[in-house]
Amino acid sequence: MNILLANNKLRYLGGTETYTYALAAQLVKTGHRVEAFTFRKGLISDRMKRDLGVPTTNATGKYDVVLANHSTTVKALREKKAGFIIQTCHGVTTALEQPSPFAHAWVAVSKELSAHVEAITEVKTPVILNGIDCHRFKPVNPAGEKLTKVLSLAHDDALNDVLQDHFKKYGIKLFRLNKRKNPVWDVEKQINQADMVISLGRGAYEAMACGRPVLVVDRRPGRELKGDGIILPENIEELIACNCRGQAYQNTNIAEMVKTAVENYSPRLGEWCRQYALENLNIGKQTEKYIALCKKLIWYMY
């Protein structure tokens, strides 16, 4: 298929940006012709061109399908008559993530989002989870038998200070990696140096794919602290239903979440995380779902 991937920006590291890269890589790998559309080029679009041979285009041609992530790109590409547009919605609150009336169909990355999109569009919205490249994000160094090093991918400095103090009480070191301040492309190397990772959303999934237990908590700019605690077999479905964004439990008790994470830590939990990622978050499986949906919808429309 001739496929156009669209993202508002491909300039810096971000959730939808790395998602777009992973999807592009898998589509190219499986024989599809892929191009990208964005309003702001940069690090990600450059990597897509260099690593994958995926060029950034003004979308003057016609595509079999457009897989777009933001309402801005949907509107622009509908005006260009670029092709059948499927918008993937990644968030509930951000204006860019709201379902656009200019899309032909919608996909949501979680059950929570699916319900949100359906309430607006009155159209049944399938769920396709965030896809992770499990060949790239994989266990290289095994997690330690004892929890000694935690990597925080949280954005909020004040939260990281509090987390560091709490982990220090257990003799555990906390290291920080904020993609806004010190972006690192090959974050999987940093993840593999830690025993546990703190993150939300896609960062949590990447850590799981690397075989690391994950503590879901962060405070994003202009938003309240949100946490779901440590990901466990007994709560994973509830957390995944909200894209592991801290919305399932909305826990604000950091001391309690850290204590529970420390008590439940085990390298075996990391092994379970890896297996879950392979079975449910693998970009190969998610891409297959997109292609099947594309064929179904395009056949129905035409």
Predicted regions and their residues:
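A short, glycine/small-residue-rich beta-strand->loop->alpha-helix junction that serves as a flexible
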Residues: N7-Y19, A158
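Conserved donor-binding/catalytic core segment of Leloir-type glycosyltransferases
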Residues: V107, V127-D133, N141-Q164
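A charged, aromatic-enriched C-terminal amphipathic alpha-helix characteristic of glycosyltransferases
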Residues: G15, C244-M301
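Acidic anion/phosphate-binding donor-loop and adjacent secondary structure
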Residues: L96-P99, A115-I120, G131-K146, W185
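A short, active-site helix/loop in glycosyltransferases that binds the activated sugar's phosphate group
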Residues: E97, A103-K124, D161-V162
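Acidic donor-binding loop of glycosyltransferase active sites
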Residues: K189-Y205, R212-P213
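Active-site proximal beta-strand in glycosyltransferases
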Residues: Y63-H70, E79-T94, H104-A108, V217
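Catalytic binding pocket for nucleotide-activated donors in carbohydrate/polymer assembly enzymes
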Residues: G203-E263
